[in-house]
């Protein structure tokens, strides 16, 4: 019997309404066993709503922290929720 690991893909996003939905769909298509976290880095468009509508977990940051800040927020989420692997 194999041990199943909890895997999370972290996707930082800032004003990506034009692409975030497709990216989340692609991850779910190719890696159906993983969860997707979109870190909405203070976007002013529909990034958050579109990511959520495609099945992603969305972490909304109140303002733009940049790629480093968004990734740190994602890693903190991984740690707090107890995921085994993050991508």
Write out the residue ranges for each language-model feature.
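Structured catalytic core of nucleotide-sugar glycosyltransferases
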Residues: 1-87
């Amino acid at each position: 019997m194999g041990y199943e690991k909890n895997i999370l893909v972290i996707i930082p996003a800032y004003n990506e309404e034009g692409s975030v939905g497709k990216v989340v769909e692609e991850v779910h298509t190719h890696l159906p066993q993983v969860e997707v976290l979109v870190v909405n880095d203070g976007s002013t468009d529909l990034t958050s709503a579109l990511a959520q509508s495609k099945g992603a977990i969305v972490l909304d940051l109140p303002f733009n922290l940049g790629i480093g800040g968004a990734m740190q927020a994602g890693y903190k989420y991984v740690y707090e929720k107890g995921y085994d692997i993050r991508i």
